[in-house]
Amino acid sequence: MTAPILAAAVFCITVSVVQLTSVAIAVGRFRRSGPSGPPSKLPSAVGHFPSVSIVRPLCGIDNYAEETLSSTFDLDYPHYEILFCVASAKDPVVPFVKTLMADYASRSARLLIGDDRVSPNPKLNNVVKGWRAAHHDWIVIADSNVLMPPDYIERLFASWRDDTGLVASPPVGCRPDGVWAEVECAFLNTYQARWQYIVDTFGFGFAQGKTMLWRRGDLDAAGGIEALGKEIAEDAAATKVVRGAGLKVRLVNRPLAQPLGRRSAAEVWNRQLRWARLRRASFLLY
């Protein structure tokens, strides 16, 4: 066997072993997650069902917006408030949210409008007012296109430990409409999610901006919500803030759904390209 053939064989075997091992670890994580549904108690590091503030930054109306946003009101958790954040009063999502709030009038929900320029990141600028207005010490920042299951908050708390500074969840793409949405599902649900769970299993978890559970004091000790403006992406800054405090980012064992709907080739390509550039800018080795 010539040297090039031997090298190619070793490379193929190594890659196959790495791939199969990564799949086995990811599958093992999901199987350990247990049955769905609200637990009878939360980890000791959390306490007995503490009150939670959910901050949802909005911009425009996403695919499946009625379902994803209304899911915020249907959580099976005893004490939580909802803060919808919009940068402009002219955003078409404003009347949409007002209608939802009227339909769920028994829930504690507020719509906050305004643009606080604390960073070059428009999402973070939108979130700031929600963070400042939150009544509770446990705060979830969740993108508008996350579909929240009834046990959403319990699912986040279940991963919190004494050494945790943040719990996040990678998105699981679902309900694709068309070939390019299928491509994005394939990326989200295989390569991206799998490798995030690999590094998390070994204690090197990365924040994912789709959903982030914070304890207010941890972020305030690092300079407050404005500290997330130190990087181009708020989740990259979150990872560095948590690690800088000697704490860990952890992922939920059962990731959260993101309904995709229709996608064009350009949308998928541009999104993946933007994420790749953000990763390279914030974490050069990754």
Whereabouts are the PLM-identified features?
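Acidic donor-binding segment of Leloir-type glycosyltransferases
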Residues: 69-118
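The conserved acidic donor/metal-binding loop of glycosyltransferases
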Residues: 143-147, 225
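Conserved nucleotide-sugar donor-binding
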Residues: 135-137, 207-222
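N-terminal membrane-anchoring/stem segments of glycan-assembly enzymes
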Residues: 1-45, 182-186, 194-198
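A short, amphipathic alpha-helix embedded in the catalytic core of nucleotide-handling enzymes
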Residues: 72, 99, 130, 149-160, ...
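Short aromatic/hydrophobic "clamp" motif used to bind/position activated sugar donors
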Residues: 127, 139
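Cell-envelope/extracellular polymer assembly enzymes that use nucleotide-activated donors
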Residues: 50-53, 81, 237
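Catalytic donor/gating beta->alpha subdomain of glycosyltransferases that bind UDP-sugars
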Residues: 160, 166-192, 217-220, 225-286
